[in-house]
From Swiss-Prot:
Disulfide bonds: none annotated. This is Na(+)/H(+) antiporter NhaB. It comes from Salmonella arizonae (strain ATCC BAA-731 / CDC346-86 / RSK2980). One of its GO terms (cellular component) is plasma membrane. Na(+)/H(+) antiporter that extrudes sodium in exchange for external protons. The gene is nhaB.
Length: 514
């Protein structure tokens, strides 16, 4: 018997999301207009809380859908205007171009990145050194590339290696289902569990590495570019101004990586089983023998394009998104990718998040129009200049650990810039606050997958169920990093940021403030 029209519509609404989630969103959509016409300030904060809820529940439904419905309703009832949303999008066009073109550009360099991580995995036998190598490699790559892409590459390596061993363990060849362990002997299952633990720890080290490297440069994370644009900084300026905080944090993050591996704390310390290593080594040897001269040329070309990418970013030869577009053109033209559909696949990773970011800007427009953050900013600005840095760092860190750091960073940098333009703070103080905001959004946000887009991407990937990486386990494994990164970042903002920036200005490394 066919279901009723109403039931069919209910099932279609937000698809496979739980019924309670669908009901919650409908309640939000009903109460928002009623609240807005009663008290617009309360309604604005209600909308922000609801939007953060959709980000926190990203595993139930991709936030673009519920967040988009809330944003559309906000425009319709007059919480903001379509014109203001367009202004916010136009002001942040560079960030959208970064996500569209840079992520797609790096997609065409995946062969080189896969080659690098495969070499690391098979050539380093010490688990501590290997973990450190993955963390450092992810940090370095994330300083110049998008963190999502770096994590996507490491996921590709892990899924590939897991699949190779799982096929051998199940003896089912190409028909093997990686989610099905029923055909695997108990002995192989024990080895497989150890392999899962090994991959979990490597993925977490790589994920944290993207945060350690991503905070250091203006292209490492989308919000970095928003903050850099607001402060008028180029690539070199951004790196130098962040370094009093980011360099000590990087060192302490790497020491944490070594410590948790050595002590086998928080689920770390599993080594690569020798039986698995032998299987993977045989497969890699076979792959290398089958690599043609054409394949080798592709790797060389991708390496040269990588050098161009780093050089162009460091010298600020063009806007970040346009440099990404140049990578797409060079990588496709010189490696023979000419089919439209093959090129189109490169954009599938970035466009949903680009659309979600556009929805963020709609919520930001509401925050500006309804003056939602005015009381918080006034409270912070009443403190001494030194205390302002700590408060901005802590407020950003708290919100970023439960919400998306792009959203939080955008809100706070806009408010800080408005305070400077209104004469509430000096240009010098604004630039220090920009560092506090950037580090506050990037470092404590490793606490949960909600805060870091790369972590959320890992949690929702095909790899997570294979290696038994749940939300709770991810939070637990991130805990030592969360504590160390947050505390070291806070101490650096408190004690080293202002004096080191002053010293660099006097040394002529930074432009003298007018």
């Amino acid at each position: 018997m066919e279901i009723s029209w109403g039931r069919a519509m209910w099932r279609n609404f937000l698809g496979q999301s739980p019924d309670w989630y669908k009901l919650a969103l409908l309640v939000f959509l009903i109460i928002n207009p009623l609240t807005f016409f009663t008290n617009s300030f309360v309604a604005g904060w209600l909308l922000v809380a609801e939007f953060i809820f959709t980000l926190a529940m990203a595993l139930k439904c991709y936030p673009l859908l519920p967040g988009g419905l809330l944003a559309i309703e906000a425009v319709v009832i007059g919480m903001t205007s379509a014109a203001h949303v367009r202004e916010e999008v136009a002001a942040n066009l560079e960030v959208l171009l970064l996500l569209m073109f840079m992520v797609a550009g790096i997609y065409f360099m995946k062969q080189l990145l896969l080659f690098i991580f495969t070499r690391l995995l098979l050539s380093i036998r010490s688990k501590m050194v290997l973990s450190l190598a993955f963390c450092v490699a992810a940090a370095f790559l994330s300083a110049f590339l998008d963190a999502l892409t770096v994590v996507a590459v490491v996921i590709s390596v892990a899924v590939g290696f897991y699949g190779i061993y799982h096929r051998v363990a199940s003896s089912r060849g190409e028909e093997n289902d990686m989610l099905d362990d029923s055909h695997i002997d108990q002995h192989y299952k024990t080895v497989l569990e150890q392999f899962r633990g090994f991959l979990r720890s490597l993925m977490m080290h790589a994920g944290v590495g993207t945060a350690l490297g991503g905070v250091m440069t203006m292209v490492g994370e989308p919000q970095n570019l928003i903050i850099a644009k607001a402060a008028g900084w180029h690539f070199g300026d951004f790196f130098l101004r962040m370094s009093p905080v980011t360099v000590p944090v990087l060192v302490c993050g790497l020491l944490t990586c070594m410590l948790v591996e050595k002590m086998r704390w928080f689920g770390y310390g599993e080594t690569l089983p020798e039986k698995v290593r032998n299987v993977l080594q045989q497969f890699d040897d076979q792959s290398r023998k089958q690599r043609t001269r054409q394949d080798k040329i592709k790797l060389i070309v991708q390496a040269i394009i990588g050098v161009w990418l780093v050089t162009a970013l460091a010298l600020h030869l063009a806007e970040v998104g346009l440099i990404g577009l140049s990578v797409i053109i060079l990588a496709t033209a010189l490696t023979g990718v000419t089919d439209e559909h093959a090129i189109g696949k490169a954009f599938t990773e970035s466009l949903p998040f680009t659309a979600l970011l556009t929805v963020f800007f709609s919520i930001v427009a509401v925050i500006i129009d309804q003056h939602l953050f005015a009381p918080i900013i006034q409270f912070v600005l009443q403190a001494s200049e030194h205390a302002q840095l700590t408060l901005f760092y802590l407020f950003n860190g708290l919100l970023s650990s439960i919400s998306d750091n792009v959203f939080v960073g955008t809100i706070y940098i806009n408010e800080a810039k408005a305070a400077m333009e209104n004469g509430a703070i000096s240009l010098k103080q604004f630039e220090l606050l920009a560092v506090a905001i950037n580090t506050g959004t990037n470092l404590p946000s490793v606490a949960t997958p909600n805060g870091q887009a790369a972590f959320l991407f890992l949690l929702t990937s095909a790899l997570a169920p294979l290696i038994r990486l749940s939300y709770g386990r991810m939070v637990w494994m991130a805990l030592p990093y969360t504590i160390i990164l947050t505390l070291v970042g806070l101490l650096c903002v408190e004690f080293t940021l202002a004096p080191v920036n002053e010293w660099m200005t006097q040394a002529g490394w930074l432009a003298t403030l007018s």
